[in-house]
Amino acid sequence: MQITDVRVRKIAAEGKMKAIVSVTFDNEFVVHDIKVIEGQNGLFIAMPSRKTPDGEYKDIAHPINTETREKIQKSIIEEYERAKMEEESSEKVQE
């Protein structure tokens, strides 16, 4: 399964959640609402989740193995960094 598109849909300057991302696989399947989070050890992703009645969060969709998670995370963080740099450079042009 190949990652064929990563779209950074929202970038936040405040708080720990830095972006919301959609990832397309094989031009056939998309997963929305993957979050880019800033943690103590740098950026990581949080897969889309829902809150259970007892207050616990459960992933709706997630990679089954570490290799796939790392591949998805690497692609998302690279695209987030690129989008963030583009946004910052366009803000400088407007000033």
From Swiss-Prot:
Organism for this UniProt entry: Clostridium botulinum (strain Hall / ATCC 3502 / NCTC 13319 / Type A)
Keywords: Cell cycle, Cell division, Septation
Full protein name: Putative septation protein SpoVG
Functional note: Could be involved in septation.
Family the entry assigns: Belongs to the SpoVG family.
InterPro entries referenced in this protein's UniProt entry, alphabetically: SpoVG, SpoVG_sf
Keyword Cell division part of the UniProt annotation: yes
One biological process term in Gene Ontology: sporulation resulting in formation of a cellular spore
Pfam families: SpoVG
Domain of life: Bacteria
